[in-house]
Each structure stands twice: as C-alpha cells, then as structure tokens.
C-alpha cells in the first residue's frame, strides 16, 4: 500500500490531521511492515469498512501527534521530523542507512522495534510483499551504532510479560541486543531493550514486536507502547 493510500485510509478513519482528538503536536514518522495503518487482509478496502476496528496504537499515536507514514527513508522524507517509529521494517538500502544515521545524530528521536522472529499471524502468504517482515534485517544500521541483535533459537514459543524500562511489556520469542562496550548505550532487561544517546539524538530499541499485536484483552499493550514512545521522545 502506498503512502497516499495510507493517508486516505487514515483520513477516512479520522486519525490523520486534527481528526478524532489528535493533538496538534509535532508529526511522528511511522515506517513499518506491520498492519497498524491498514488491515491484514487481502480484501481491497477492508480497512475502510464501517465495521472495521482501527488498531489501538493509532490512539496512542494520536495522543502525541499526527502520524506521517513513510515508504522510504531519505533526507527529504526525514527532514521535517523530529520523532520517528520504525517497527519491524523491511531491510534498509545503503542510502537509507546513511539517511537514518544522519537524522538520529542530528537530533532525531527514534523508537525502534526489531523482532528477529516475528510471531504475528498474517493472512498474506509467505513471499507476498504485503506480509509483515518475518525477521528484522538491520545489521548495517545497528552496526553503525555499535549494536548487535541476537536470537536464542532454544526459546519456547508463547507470549510472556517482561519488565522493560519499568513497563510490563508482552513479548514472544524476543531477541536481545548486545552493545560493544560503548558508554553511550544502556541495556535493559538482559538486552531485551537498549537506550542510546547518538550524537544529538536518541534511540530506544526493543528486540521484539509483540507489543504491537492487535489482540489486547488486558490493556497491557497500549500502556507499554505509550511508555516506550514517551521514553524515546523525551527531551534530552
């Protein structure tokens, strides 16, 4: 789905611009393969049905600013943003890695969700470009920040709750970050999360994306995601 189509869908749902209680704060860039802005369904226009339920994360975003969907990461796309969420993205191209690194070092605040073994179910078949990215492939940009994303394949699948930055956060087959001894990064929950001061900017990264799944009978996900956003976007 293109950015134009996403913007149309968001406007129809009332989540773009000043709709449905959105604050007048700064825009928040969103770069993701997860079905947050659209329905995980091959049916055309399914997210615009009157009975369609918007993803709960849209309200969390709207409480903090307006969503700016991104298809690519370039200097021109990032220039008007100070806040960015990258959630289980596709692999970045070389120029995108440079643009993102420059943006963070110039003062950008990034929340990154990088899942090495995504457990989210999808109606799209394996190989369909609309299917969420199964494995985070972010070694080049993480390497620029002297981080490694690791995965223990001996884990048993199943959702659990872990405390991250003081937040009870649902995870499922999470990875962990390893730092290379740099003083500007701090690991949390045995590496499940990491916070880094990079240049004038900040990165808060979580090695799992289960927090953004739609199902949430306990209300844990919105609280955890809101806390992660606030940690990433707080002034330095």
Residue ranges and their predicted role:
Residues 1-236:
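Short, surface-exposed patches at the edges or C-terminal ends of soluble domains, predominantly
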């Amino acid at each position: 789905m293109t950015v134009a189509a996403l913007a149309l869908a968001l406007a129809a749902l009332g989540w773009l611009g000043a709709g449905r209680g959105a604050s007048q704060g700064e825009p928040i860039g969103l770069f993701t393969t997860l079905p947050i802005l659209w329905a995980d369904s091959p049916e055309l226009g399914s997210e615009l049905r009157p009975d369609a339920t918007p993803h709960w994360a849209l309200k969390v975003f709207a409480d903090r600013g307006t969503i700016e969907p991104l298809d690519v990461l370039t200097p021109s796309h990032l220039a008007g943003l100070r806040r960015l969420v990258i959630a289980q993205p596709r692999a970045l191209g070389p120029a995108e890695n440079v643009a993102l690194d420059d943006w963070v070092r110039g003062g950008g605040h990034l929340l990154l969700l990088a899942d090495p073994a995504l457990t989210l179910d999808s109606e799209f078949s394996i190989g369909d470009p609309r299917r969420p990215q199964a494995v985070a492939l972010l070694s080049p940009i993480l390497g620029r920040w002297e981080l490694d994303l690791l995965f223990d394949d001996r884990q048993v699948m199943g959702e659990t709750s872990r405390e991250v930055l003081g937040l009870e956060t649902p995870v499922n087959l999470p990875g962990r970050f390893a730092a290379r001894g740099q003083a500007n990064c701090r690991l949390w929950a045995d590496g499940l999360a990491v916070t880094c001061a990079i240049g004038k900017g900040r990165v808060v990264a979580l090695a799992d994306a289960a927090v953004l799944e739609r199902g949430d009978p306990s209300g844990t996900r919105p609280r955890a995601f809101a806390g992660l956003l606030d940690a990433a976007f707080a002034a330095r």
